[in-house]
Swiss-Prot record:
This is Ribosomal RNA small subunit methyltransferase G. The lineage of its organism: Bacteria, Pseudomonadati, Bacteroidota, Bacteroidia, Bacteroidales. One of its GO terms (molecular function) is rRNA (guanine-N7-)-methyltransferase activity. The keyword Ubl conjugation does not apply. S-adenosyl-L-methionine binds at G71, F76, A122, E123, R135. Belongs to the methyltransferase superfamily. RNA methyltransferase RsmG family. It is found in: Cytoplasm. PANTHER family: S-ADENOSYL-L-METHIONINE-DEPENDENT METHYLTRANSFERASES SUPERFAMILY PROTEIN. It comes from Phocaeicola vulgatus (strain ATCC 8482 / DSM 1447 / JCM 5826 / CCUG 4940 / NBRC 14291 / NCTC 11154) (Bacteroides vulgatus). HAMAP family: 16SrRNA_methyltr_G. CDD domains: AdoMet_MTases. Gene3D superfamilies: Vaccinia Virus protein VP39 (3.40.50.150). Its EC number is 2.1.1.-. NCBIfam families: rsmG_gidB (TIGR00138).
Amino acid sequence: MELILKYFPNLSEQQKTQFAALYDLYTDWNSKINVISRKDITNLYEHHVLHSLGIAKVINFTPDTQIMDLGTGGGFPGIPLAILFPEVQFHLVDSIGKKVKVATEIANAIGLKNVTFRHCRAEEEKRKFDFVVSRAVMPLGDLIKIIRKNIRQEQHNALPNGLICLKGGELEQETMPVKHKTMLYDLKNEFTEDFFKTKKVVYVTISGL
């Protein structure tokens, strides 16, 4: 929890309470339904919560922004972002029902009011959003093909509507074929921990489609 306050020192008391509750909740649920590697649960705040919040270092979402978290798994990056942006609406989608159950139960336990959930495949979600966020669920080109239909045209954020992904490693081969405007942000410039040395936020403009 101290790690979150290190980089986000201006949290409200409610946000602090919500972030602090995540460790016990994920530890408990993860013992029943595996949504995080059992070996990695002790790194929850660094590898999962703070990593999710890396998106907030790229864009400060305006109130009433509508965001879909595609392939949310146990709720990443959607739940940490929903805590940080209480006036933004998040819709968390995953094709695995038991993972959606965990994310739903955790969101309810901490009193998140700005999240909804759906158990479905990405292709089945037809609604429009300002942004789609995701954490390394599939190659970038494949992801763009699936979510193009979900990006609305109306703009009200500093960045045009589009896709924001958390990815790691060498991404040149993955981003080179992408025809949309793509920007890479190195999280090592925001977070000093070794885990973030190869981690990036990938932003793809997909507005107006």
